[in-house]
């Protein structure tokens, strides 16, 4: 991917206007369907299967908070396979938006900064569940693990769950790191 680089002094960089916040978009059904179709070969190759426990208690049009462990690059494909056709927005680092913001927003990504308090993210998540009526996919570990094991969750995740006031769904994956390590 090519990134445009502009040479400027430190003072010129500071004089740049601040980035304007954009509200999240409801994920496009077209992009969700393409992602599901593109995911199929990898999931078939891994003999992917899942067990849904208690999902019948959540209505198909009811937004929820989806918490998923993050152990390899197949995570998004697995989430799409498990949750399809339920629309969901994905919490994603802002550096993933460089050069492809329109695509990331069309898929339903919400930009955030890692490892710091981000009140804008909480407001965006509230906007998704209350206004857009979409679920939110969150990887609370905030990074891939290097050995496929789970890392401790931050204590602030409880505050987030309480603020959203929606059902919580947990997707726990096993063995995918062995298939597609980092």
Predicted regions and their residues:
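Catalytic core of membrane glycerolipid acyltransferases/transacylases, capturing the structured
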Residues: 60-117
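Helix-to-loop junction immediately C-terminal to a conserved catalytic motif
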Residues: 32, 38-70
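Helix-adjacent hinge/juxtasegments
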Residues: 110-133
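A cross-family acyltransferase "interaction/gating" segment
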Residues: 148-182
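Catalytic-site beta-strand/loop segments enriched in glycine and acidic/polar residues
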Residues: 128-158
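Hydrophobic/aromatic ligand-binding patch that stacks against planar heteroaromatic rings
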Residues: 82, 103, 128, 159-163
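Soluble, non-transmembrane catalytic domains of enzymes that act on hydrophobic metabolites at membranes
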Residues: 1-14
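Residue-level preference for the first positions of well-ordered beta-strands
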Residues: 63-65, 133-139, 169
């Amino acid at each position: 991917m090519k990134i445009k680089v502009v040479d400027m002094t430190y003072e010129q960089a500071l004089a740049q206007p601040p980035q304007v916040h954009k509200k999240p978009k409801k994920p496009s059904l077209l992009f969700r369907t393409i992602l599901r179709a593109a995911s199929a070969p990898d999931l078939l190759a891994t003999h992917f299967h899942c067990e849904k426990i208690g999902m019948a208690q959540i209505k198909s049009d009811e937004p929820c908070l989806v918490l998923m462990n993050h152990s390899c690059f197949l995570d998004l494909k697995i989430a799409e396979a498990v949750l399809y056709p339920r629309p969901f927005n994905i919490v994603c680092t802002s550096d993933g938006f460089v050069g492809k913001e329109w695509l990331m927003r069309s898929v339903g990504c919400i930009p955030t900064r890692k490892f710091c308090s981000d009140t804008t993210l909480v407001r965006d998540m509230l906007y998704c569940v209350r206004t857009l009526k979409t679920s939110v996919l969150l990887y609370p570990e905030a990074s891939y693990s290097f050995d496929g094991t789970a890392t401790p969750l931050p204590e602030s995740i409880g505050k987030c769950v309480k603020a959203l006031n929606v059902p919580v769904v947990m997707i726990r994956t096993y063995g995918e790191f062995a298939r597609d390590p980092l």
